[in-house]
Curated annotation (Swiss-Prot):
Name of protein: Ribosomal RNA small subunit methyltransferase G
Primary localization: cytoplasm
Cellular component aspect of the GO annotation: cytosol
Name of the gene encoding the protein in the UniProt record: rsmG
One GO MF term attached to the UniProt entry: rRNA (guanine-N7-)-methyltransferase activity
EC class of the enzyme, as a word: transferase
């Protein structure tokens, strides 16, 4: 069902490469412990949700010049949300920070076998050199207070911090003093409550 929904919503994507990616996750999951998703749930909460929410996040960026966006995905694990989005939008400049070596090896395999170009940093985000990213994102990595701390040294003015969250995000906002995140609900077709906690760094 959701595999077909992906095709319907994103007709211009490289669906063959997306299928290869899904098959690679299914094949590698036993050895790398990548995700609890499989089958139709993988297409729903892994693929569709990633593309849909990343499209939404990119829409929050003021990109009147239509420049190539530089995106950092923190702790992507099996590649969510950035790899499905990269497959549908190969023009972006993607960097992934992943500290777990097994998952990092999987992401290297993804790059090679799918011929995807992205920068892979196999260490914690706190240890990477500051760069002028347009967007820093993460999904299911940490609460907002921790994300605020670990990204503090790597962003620049005008960087958009945009983190994919569930309904508990409102508690996280209350616990993150002086963080000043805005919360917006992402209307979607998978009957799931998805929120984006975001702010532009001043």
């Amino acid at each position: 069902m959701y595999k077909r929904l992906v095709q319907e919503f994103f007709p211009k994507l490289d669906f063959e490469n997306l299928e290869k990616y899904v098959n690679l996750i299914e094949f590698s999951n036993k050895n790398f412990n990548l995700t609890a998703f499989s089958g139709d749930i993988l297409w729903k909460e892994g693929i569709f949700e990633s593309i849909f929410t990343m499209n939404f996040i990119v829409g929050l960026v003021n990109n009147k010049e239509n420049k190539k966006l530089k995106i950092l995905d923190i702790g992507a694990g099996s590649g969510f949300p950035s790899i499905p989005f990269l497959i549908t939008n190969p023009e972006i400049e993607l960097t992934i920070s992943e500290s777990m070596q097994k998952r990092c090896q999987f992401l290297k395999d993804v790059s090679e076998k799918l011929d995807l170009k992205f920068n892979l940093i196999c260490k914690p985000v706190q240890e990477i050199n500051p760069q002028k990213f347009d967007i820093i994102t993460a999904r299911a990595v940490a609460n907002l207070e921790k994300l605020e701390k670990i990204t503090k040294k790597i962003h620049f003015p005008k960087t958009l911090l945009a983190f994919i969250k569930g309904p508990k995000v409102f508690n996280e906002v209350q616990n993150c003093k002086n963080c000043n995140y805005k919360i917006i609900k992402v209307n979607n077709n998978i009957n799931k409550k998805i929120f984006i906690a975001f702010k532009q760094v001043s």
